[in-house]
């Protein structure tokens, strides 16, 4: 399979999408949302095949949870698309403007990026999220999902293609690479004549491979160790609720809690509270000081090298006792704090130190790490959570899928 023709078709579609009206794009999105619900039986049947094959292949519970669709999740995906409809279309909006001394009116106007290539793994919802956000912003997209989601994605792509046809938008606006051959990923990463940005959504290995092999700009994100530090001044009862929510609400999510750091002055009180609340679900991986205070835990083991660098994506939690906020920050710097990190504290000084010192895409004071999400941030769905510093950072919504062009208007002005 040669992806060159797919790239050419996407580039052609991108030119048409760039001038599509907001009403036309919203029409396509409304059809996608409605048909997701109307075709739920077929979509869920296809997803059941993927789940069955995933179990046979020995996928972890975390991966199976990411792969799973049910009526509730499908309705949520449809509603996310409807939320995108309600958002302002950034394309064509002015960022700023001024009048130069020579009389020229100069402005910066938002424009689509062009063609976005997205490589992702066992998350069928990403197929719809990407398609919706790219369509809203006038971008064409080339999608490559994992083999684990093959049957689910085939049904979802049918919904998208039906919507494009009914809204009179080019079929190549959203294309899907059906074959799971990794060689096709390598091809996609070299289509710099046609593709303007690559977004990998998966583990560290996928991000590394894209970064090292792509001739197209790559957005790195989604991977990072998420921490919560419980300071000595924190309200421990309220902190307990936040820690539990961050860990167990959806442990397979990239913004779920990986490592809990506790100030040594409150560890003797707080860690037994954690054990009592969470030990029926969570396996603790603890360094010696923490383990000594968690004697009642039913599932606990000693932390070994590499544990605090692990994104668990499961009901496993690293635990460590630290001397103060500075040691907590130092730990985060060493152990890949780049995604979502939080401090529980009633100290303004410590909260500001944390905000200014932790280099993550999203930092929180007295809030769960689970909030790093496009919908939670009011962005609609998201194409990714970027953990790099250039172009976009954190949940990438509509504006992050645009660039800008300079627009100069004058009265037949020539440069002197």
UniProtKB/Swiss-Prot annotation:
It comes from the Bacteria. The keyword Amino-acid biosynthesis applies. CDD domains: ALDH_F18-19_ProA-GPR (cd07079). Pathway: Amino-acid biosynthesis; L-proline biosynthesis; L-glutamate 5-semialdehyde from L-glutamate: step 2/2. Pfam families: Aldedh. Coiled coil: none annotated. PANTHER family: DELTA-1-PYRROLINE-5-CARBOXYLATE SYNTHASE, GLUTAMATE SEMIALDEHYDE DEHYDROGENASE. HAMAP family: ProA (MF_00412). It comes from Vibrio parahaemolyticus serotype O3:K6 (strain RIMD 2210633). It catalyses: L-glutamate 5-semialdehyde + phosphate + NADP(+) = L-glutamyl 5-phosphate + NADPH + H(+). GO terms for biological process: L-proline biosynthetic process. One of its GO terms (cellular component) is cytoplasm. It is an enzyme of class 1 (oxidoreductase). The keyword Amino-acid biosynthesis applies. Catalyzes the NADPH-dependent reduction of L-glutamate 5-phosphate into L-glutamate 5-semialdehyde and phosphate. The product spontaneously undergoes cyclization to form 1-pyrroline-5-carboxylate. One of its GO terms (molecular function) is NADP binding. Keywords: Amino-acid biosynthesis, Cytoplasm, NADP, Oxidoreductase, Proline biosynthesis. This is Gamma-glutamyl phosphate reductase. Its main location: cytoplasm.
């Amino acid at each position: 399979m040669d992806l060159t023709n797919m790239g050419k078709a996407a580039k052609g579609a991108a030119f048409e999408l760039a001038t599509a009206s907001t009403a036309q794009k919203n029409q396509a999105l409304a059809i996608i949302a409605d048909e997701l619900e109307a075709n739920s039986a077929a979509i869920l049947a296809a997803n059941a095949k993927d789940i069955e094959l995933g179990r046979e292949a020995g996928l972890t519970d975390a991966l199976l949870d990411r792969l799973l669709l049910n009526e509730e999740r499908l309705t949520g995906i449809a509603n996310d698309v409807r939320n995108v409809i309600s958002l302002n279309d950034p394309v064509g909006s002015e960022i700023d403007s001024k009048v130069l001394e020579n009389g020229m009116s100069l402005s910066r106007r938002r424009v689509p990026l062009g063609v976005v290539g997205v490589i992702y793994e066992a998350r069928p919802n990403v197929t719809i999220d990407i398609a919706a956000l790219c369509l809203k912003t006038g971008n064409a997209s080339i999608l490559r999902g994992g083999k684990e989601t093959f049957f689910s994605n085939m049904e979802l792509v049918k919904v998208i293609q039906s919507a494009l046809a009914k809204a009179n938008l080019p079929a190549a606006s959203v294309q899907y690479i059906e074959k799971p051959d990794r060689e096709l990923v390598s091809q996609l990463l070299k289509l710099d004549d046609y593709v303007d940005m690559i977004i990998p959504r998966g583990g560290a290995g996928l991000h590394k491979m894209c970064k090292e092999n792509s001739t197209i700009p790559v957005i790195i994100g989604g991977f990072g160790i998420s921490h919560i530090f419980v300071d000595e001044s924190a309200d421990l009862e309220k902190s307990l609720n936040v820690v539990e929510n961050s860990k167990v609400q959806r442990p397979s999510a990239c913004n779920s809690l990986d490592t809990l750091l506790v100030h040594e002055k409150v560890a003797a009180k707080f860690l037994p509270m954690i054990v009592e609340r969470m030990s029926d679900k969570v396996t603790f991986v603890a360094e010696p000081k923490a383990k000594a205070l968690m004697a009642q835990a039913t599932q606990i083991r000693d932390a070994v090298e590499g544990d605090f660098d692990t994104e668990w994506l499961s009901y496993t939690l690293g635990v460590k006792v630290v001397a103060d906020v500075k040691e907590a920050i130092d730990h985060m710097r060493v152990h890949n704090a780049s995604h979502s990190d939080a401090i529980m504290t009633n100290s303004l000084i410590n909260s500001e130190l944390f905000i200014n010192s932790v280099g993550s895409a999203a930092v929180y004071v007295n809030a769960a790490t689970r909030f790093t999400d496009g919908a939670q941030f009011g962005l609609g769905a998201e194409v990714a959570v970027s953990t790099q510093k250039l172009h976009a950072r954190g949940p990438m919504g509509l504006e992050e899928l645009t660039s800008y062009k300079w627009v100069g208007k004058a009265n037949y002005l020539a440069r002197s």
